[in-house]
Amino acid sequence: MSCCIANAIRWDVSLLIHRSMSSSMSSVQPTSPVSDSPSLGEMHASVAVSRRGHWGFRLLAFLGPGYMVSVGYMDPGNWATGLAGGSRFGYMLLSVILLSNVMAIVLQALAARLGIASDMDLAQACRARYSRGTNLALWAVCELAIIACDLAEVIGTAIALNLLLGVPIILGAVITAVDVVLVLLLMHRGFRALEAFVIALLLVIFGCFVVQIVLAAPPLQEVLGGFVPRWQVVADPQALYLAIGIVGATVMPHNLYLHSSIVQTRAYPRTPVGRRSALRWAVADSTLALMLALFINASILILAAAVFHAQHHFDVEEIEQAYQLLAPVLGVGVAATLFATALLASGINSTVTATLAGQIVMEGFLRLRLRPWLRRVLTRGLAIVPVIVVVALYGEQGTGRLLLLSQVILSMQLPFAVIPLLRCVADRKVMGALVAPRWLMVVAWLIAGVIVVLNVKLLGDYAVHLMVGVSD
């Protein structure tokens, strides 16, 4: 796989370097109407695709955007819910992870369809469809979601640095600001370099969990049985709460904006036939990538079930707690190191996608373009401050509550991304011949309904939890 990716990168590197060099001169350009120009203009159609030859080479040309999107499905919020679900209920909630992954596959396929059919990302499509006031509101809640996601990345990276190197959480949070240099270097080298970096770290995460699962040796029959839905998930209030958390933490709202934009980086023919072919390959790319995300999220829960639940550790909810228990329970010190390494790779990976998502949202809604380094500094700065304040006031234990708050904020924003997406892909004026078929829209609206109901329930439970905490 790595050989094929390297060949694909070498194939179009000259085109990428030319475009990325010109992009480095861009600054704030509020006068350039984004709705009249392509999303991420400097990277638009910058990746050459093969129109002939073996299907495998054509698929390789489209591999990348789906894996960048999949990063959002493995953030520390997913880690926390997976650890809690596995330690408390064993393998029972694997069915919820599978269901939420199917939902994500459908929604990301629709986001890719919008980008390929309309040559607009979701933010641009919203700007063309809604009033100025509505667009400002959508932009504001989306920016809040991106900051919340970045907050989870700061916490995850800081915790990983603390576990691996003993770096204090506050210092680790400050160190994460340096990642702006990494983002700039990668963006300067072109979009294929970004994708290669993300995929490489995903392979690191994958490898870490493969080793940990082998060491944990979970019973295969129980693991497979966990993917079968059970009534107990709904009947048990605690299981239902964790199930809602898993679904709410899985579909990331900014991923819909991101995916609708970065699928347009491929230089496919902008013709009806070319768009239809590009859509097939883009959906294949995102489906394969989200299956990798399914494996990693399931691995977190399986690891917690095999290591903690089996040893009667039923209340493992903090990432630090899981790290401290892994080595003694498994009897292998490297298991905990691999766990923290995977967490660090996840946090670094999210840096790239969060920067792109922020740029896409700002350009699409406001017609405002900032240099990537300035955009990154603003977002990361707003994410670091709450971490420093919470740790200073409540100690390192407060990061767990802050992580939960970030997931609640993401849940609040989700309907404001899903519903506009579904309305756009069902509009023939926007989509043309690639308008979503009726059966697909029925499925998509059912998924949207489930997500909205579950997120409302999650928010209600969180509000009750806060009120109980205040009364105590």
UniProtKB/Swiss-Prot annotation:
Annotated localization: Cell inner membrane
Q: What is the species of this protein?
A: Xylella fastidiosa (strain Temecula1 / ATCC 700964)
Q: Which domain of life is it from?
A: Bacteria
Which residue ranges does UniProt annotate as crossing the membrane? Answer: 59-79, 92-112, 144-164, 167-187, 196-216, 233-253, 288-308, 325-345, 377-397, 402-422, 439-459
MF terms (GO), sorted A to Z = cadmium ion transmembrane transporter activity; manganese ion transmembrane transporter activity; metal ion binding; symporter activity
Give a short account of what the protein does.
Answer: H(+)-stimulated, divalent metal cation uptake system.
Kindly name one Pfam family recorded for this protein: Nramp
Could you identify this protein by its name?
A: Divalent metal cation transporter MntH
Q: What keywords is this UniProt entry annotated with?
A: Cell inner membrane, Cell membrane, Ion transport, Membrane, Symport, Transmembrane, Transmembrane helix, Transport
The UniProt entry's GO biological process terms, in alphabetical order, are:
iron ion transmembrane transport
Q: What is its main location?
A: membrane
Gene Ontology terms: cellular component: plasma membrane
Gene that produces this protein: mntH
